Amino acid sequence: MAKKALVVKDERKRALACRSREKRSAVRNMRNDKTISLKERVAIQAKLNSLPRNSSPARSKNRCSITGRPRGYYRKFGISRIQLRVLANWGKLPGVVKSSW
């Protein structure tokens, strides 16, 4: 089980990234606009750098919704590999069957 503080910290990062998504994307689009002069684009890059670091969506980690484990995460189910195995063995995941040949 992951530490609760790390799970809460990651939730805060996701919330901040969600709140500042539009502003960050607007500044990024202005920075990538080739019609603007290089000097102005450097100033826009400085503006992008002044945004909070945790407002970037790349800084949040995918975590298991049950245990909070950050590694071995399956996006399709939203859980870690360990919980996937447990729930699949119990038959709690629809459409998941144990393979045999």
Swiss-Prot record:
Protein name in the entry: Small ribosomal subunit protein uS14
PROSITE patterns associated with the record: RIBOSOMAL_S14
Transmembrane residue ranges: none
Family affiliation: Belongs to the universal ribosomal protein uS14 family.
GO molecular function: rRNA binding; structural constituent of ribosome
InterPro entries, sorted: Ribosomal_uS14, Ribosomal_uS14_bac/plastid, Ribosomal_uS14_CS
Organism expressing this protein natively: Neorickettsia sennetsu (strain ATCC VR-367 / Miyayama) (Ehrlichia sennetsu)
Summary of subunit composition and partner proteins: Part of the 30S ribosomal subunit. Contacts proteins S3 and S10.
Gene3D superfamilies documented for this protein: 1.10.287.1480
Keyword Membrane: no
